[in-house]
Amino acid sequence: MARAFPLERVRNIGIAAHIDAGKTTCTERILFYSGVVHKMGEVHDGAAVTDWMAQERERGITITAAAISTTWDDHRINIIDTPGHVDFTIEVERSMRVLDGVIAVFCAVGGVQPQSETVWRQADRYSVPRMVFVNKMDRTGADFLKVHGQIKDRLKANAVPIQLPIGAENDLKGIIDLVENKAYIYKDDLGKDIEQTEVPSDMVDLVSDWRSKLMESIAETEEELLEAFLENGELTIEQLKSGIREGVLKHGVVPMLCGSAFKNKGVQLLLDAVVNYLPAPVDVPPIQGLLPNGKEAVRPSDDGAPFSALAFKVMADPYGKLTFVRMYSGVLEKGSYVLNSTKDAKERISRLIILKADDREEVDELRAGDLGAVLGLKNTTTGDTLCASEEAIVLETLYIPEPVISVAVEPKTKSDMEKLGKALTSLSEEDPTFRVSTDQETNQTVIAGMGELHLEILVDRMLREFKVEANIGAPQVSYRETIRASSSGEGKFARQTGGKGQYGHVVIEVEPGEPGTGFEFVNKIVGGSVPKEYIKPAESGMRETCESGVIAGYPLIDVKVTLVDGSYHDVDSSEMAFKIAGSMAFKDGIKKCNPVLLEPMMKVEVEVPEDFLGSIIGDLSSRRGQVEGQSIEDGQSKVQSKVPLAEMFGYATQLRSMTQGRGIFSMEFSTYEEVPRNVAEAIISKNQGNS
């Protein structure tokens, strides 16, 4: 089957921003103007096409990354609308991993906000080219150039306006295109009757000034353009367009556009910019991966290359399990068999789907550069590679953050107990930041996630989708344990019961690992003191002990273990004996390595009227917070601080009462830090049942 759109005319883009910057409304307008929907859906009415989960429509926020295909100017545009709430950061993370370009939406009033910075960092992590759309230009206090300054200062980006608003707030009449040096005046409320005209006389000087700045910025991106600029004193429209595109692809330029999605202004020009400036799959570097022999390899964006794809999202569906894939190379055909190289398992491709939010179109194949979904894969989860069996490769996977908060879940009835297991399995398959475990002491089921809202939504989904009624415990902090010193450990398990005995013996060295490595195991056995078949069981015993910690029952992180010696018995040694010996050695070593407790620290930004600044700082300090910065703008104070999550429960209520309801705050995970000794002692004592 021939390709519907050449790869050069495909755009895989994401729309990402801080909560309430207007991402979903922006997506809705794109769908309206490109003809996918014929009636606009509004987020506040619960009718947005991309907000298809019940909780999204009720809360007016986007929780999952919805994928939609549309067309514009003879280009295929695949769009992912991502959530802005920090609790759903994995949705943004996995979207960034599979996109070629991003539209970062900023509120013209709020400007750069904490989650905007998080999204920007995520785009940096995956080197995603981007452009900026300053939305809500119709709102009181809207200021395009103020946002431009904030993006340059706070995000350290070379933001270059390629548009200017004509008017602002209630007087937003249209948009100046600085590249074409033209004005677009909106004549109707639907944004379809647009008059292209000359720049208004009262804006000629301002436009001339910003157009010169645009030319200077673009000239600096390429030597040829700089020569042309110095020779002629200006750049042609074509030179400007090609220069902006090159600048975006090389991460040297971030074009800035403006408008009001809600008031239907600026969306068609935004679509033009997506086509003109954001990359096609062939414009970005080919995806890298590892071959079975451990060598690095790349897969070019080409239908003729061996098939490779990344599963970036798994979702429960009435017809079975939907696995969203980004096609990187080759062709995937319905009815074929492929390899899941991450799990070394074969998968059959029963049905292929292209999604239009909650609508779908079945197709016979997906090609390089496509975003689509596969129905009915058995073994594939988020971050897995699918590839041709004869051309195996494992692609770079996703960064998955650790959960920071947990609650106990207790089903109300026996039938709920049976349904709970099914619900938790399904939800954890969909969301890698949602973890399920069993408390060894109480035998309770414990669920962990990225924040209170994250867990609240998941519990709500258990009730709605799986009909599970459960009692939910109070939120608990997900502490971690680590070590600060190095030592050795030894474990010898020897037991004689009747005939065959049990014997396993290992000697290890334990030391702090690199931050973010979790548990690292190195085998340095020489001469066969521990046979090869017993090394994996010994490691397994250590890993399991790692999960339950040694001082307070929390998982151990950033620990490096080296297996250096041991002994075995020809008759009595077994895998189980070495697993137990490994666990014993690990406990022995860790106790001598100065184990400490770590707690999640949150990056907290509070915005309050100036009068309340003193009491807010005092309150944050009383919560063991460290104030890292503050600023005052237009009578509003912003305080940036780092506060332990354990001290932040109930903060929203406290902030409301301290500021008469006029304060707002945002919170996101920052890092794990050591718990002060007096606090740690209380936590350890409580967990050991001594309090």
From Swiss-Prot:
Matching PANTHER family: RIBOSOME-RELEASING FACTOR 2, MITOCHONDRIAL, TRANSLATION ELONGATION FACTOR G-RELATED
Signal peptide stretch: none
Organism name: Prochlorococcus marinus (strain NATL2A)
Listed PROSITE patterns: G_TR_1 (PS00301), G_TR_2 (PS51722)
Domain tr-type G per the UniProt entry, residue ranges: 8-282
Subcellular location per the Swiss-Prot or TrEMBL entry: Cytoplasm
CDD domains, per database record: EF-G (cd01886), EFG_III (cd16262), EFG_mtEFG1_IV (cd01434), EFG_mtEFG_C (cd03713), EFG_mtEFG_II (cd04088)
Superkingdom of source: Bacteria
Family according to the record: Belongs to the TRAFAC class translation factor GTPase superfamily. Classic translation factor GTPase family. EF-G/EF-2 subfamily.
InterPro entries associated with the record: EFG_II, EFG_III, EFG_III/V, EFG_IV, EFG_V, EFG_V-like, EFTu-like_2, G_TR_CS
GO process annotations (BP): ribosome disassembly
Residue sites binding GTP per the record: 17-24, 81-85, 135-138
Pfam families, sorted: EFG_C (PF00679), EFG_III (PF14492), EFG_IV (PF03764), GTP_EFTU (PF00009), GTP_EFTU_D2 (PF03144)
Gene3D superfamilies linked: 3.30.230.10, 3.30.70.240, Elongation Factor G (Translational Gtpase), domain 3, P-loop containing nucleotide triphosphate hydrolases, Translation factors
MF terms (GO), sorted A to Z: GTP binding; GTPase activity; translation elongation factor activity
Keywords assigned: Cytoplasm, Elongation factor, GTP-binding, Nucleotide-binding, Protein biosynthesis
GO cellular component: cytoplasm
Function: Catalyzes the GTP-dependent ribosomal translocation step during translation elongation. During this step, the ribosome changes from the pre-translocational (PRE) to the post-translocational (POST) state as the newly formed A-site-bound peptidyl-tRNA and P-site-bound deacylated tRNA move to the P and E sites, respectively. Catalyzes the coordinated movement of the two tRNA molecules, the mRNA and conformational changes in the ribosome.
Protein name (database record): Elongation factor G
